[in-house]
Regions:
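Short, solvent-exposed loop/turn segments at conserved positions within beta-propeller repeat blades
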Residues: 50-51, 89-90, 136-147, 186-189, ...
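Blade/loop signatures of beta-propeller domains
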Residues: 14-23, 42, 52, 144, ...
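Short loop/turn segments immediately following beta-strands, especially the blade-tip
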Residues: 194-201, 278-285
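Beta-propeller domains
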Residues: 45-67
Length: 288
């Protein structure tokens, strides 16, 4: 009964936010394919334009190019020390950049073979890193590994595989308490979930959500554990996978991140445009 009451409370909270009154604001447009939106505790936003090989930065002074020749940067995330961790899809590696701009390669090979094309990334508060390794577009012709992967990098830098998949994974995120790992399936249009232990090890996956409209890309959680999936719209689900509502968009979403000082602005990337929406909900702490 208590769990039903909690679900009803969460659903009522989201329902109170009338979708017809939500304002979707266009922030930046005329890009080629945006992805990898990430908010920094230092008060700025990063996002990738993958085919244009750039990472953009938006802060209090406006927008500028943060990095040229980004290696086909796709997913971005900041660790607890403020360092930027990036999935470089064209370079087929995961890197970490410190405040001085020094770049360190965290992963580029598994079992002696190059990664496919790292795509999206999530970082737990204790330093455990998780990323997806599909092979979209031209990367499919360069695929060396005999599977599509979900990978884990420990704080000591050790790389292991979480899941060997036949279909391509896409977005990835953590629950607010860091005990659950969520992965979207681009081909199957599902969300998988893995239990994580204190050492960062994952259980076998189970399918939590099916029948997503459009190709599911990035995924995030709010501080109540609700799931926000970038797809044809922004599809919002309860922690147990029940659909709550959708935020309609001018074009399909590729990724998303909670940002601003109160973590109540949802920044959304589509192929060509960066959007933002103010919400009553607040982003989950593991997204930072």
């Amino acid at each position: 009964m208590r769990s039903l009451a909690i679900f009803a409370l969460l659903a009522a909270s989201l329902a109170a936010e009338d979708p017809n009154t939500i304002k979707v604001e266009r922030v930046s447009s005329n890009h080629r394919f945006l992805d990898g939106v990430a908010w920094s505790h230092d008060g700025f936003l990063l996002f990738s334009d993958v085919p244009n090989n750039r990472i953009y930065k938006m802060g209090s002074k406006g927008m500028d190019v943060f990095r040229e020749k980004s290696g086909g940067a796709s997913g971005n995330a900041f660790d607890d020390k403020g360092r930027l961790v990036t999935c470089e899809s064209a370079n087929r590696r995961v890197t970490r950049t410190n405040a001085k701009g020094e770049v360190e390669v965290l992963a580029d090979k598994f079992e002696g073979k190059r990664l496919n094309a790292p795509n999206d990334i999530a970082i737990r508060k204790d330093g455990h890193i998780y990323f997806t390794d599909p092979a979209f577009g031209q990367a499919a012709d360069q695929k060396d590994l005999p599977f599509y992967g979900v990978f884990h990098i420990t704080p000591k830098g050790e790389l292991s595989v979480v899941s060997r998949l036949e279909k391509r994974p896409n977005g990835i995120t953590l629950s607010p308490n860091g005990k659950l790992l969520y992965v979207t399936g681009a081909d199957e249009r599902v969300v998988r979930v893995y239990d994580l232990d204190r050492q960062g090890n994952a259980s076998p996956d189970r399918v939590l959500i099916t029948g997503i409209t459009g190709v599911p890309g990035g995924i995030r959680t709010d501080d109540k554990g609700n799931l926000y999936v970038a797809c044809e719209s922004i599809a919002i689900y309860s922690p147990d996978g029940r659909p709550l509502r959708n935020i309609s968009l001018p074009e399909p979403a590729t990724n998303l991140a909670f940002g601003d000082g109160d973590l109540q602005t949802l920044y959304i990337t589509t192929r060509t445009t960066l959007l933002r929406v103010r919400l009553d909900a607040k982003g989950g702490v593991q997204e930072q």
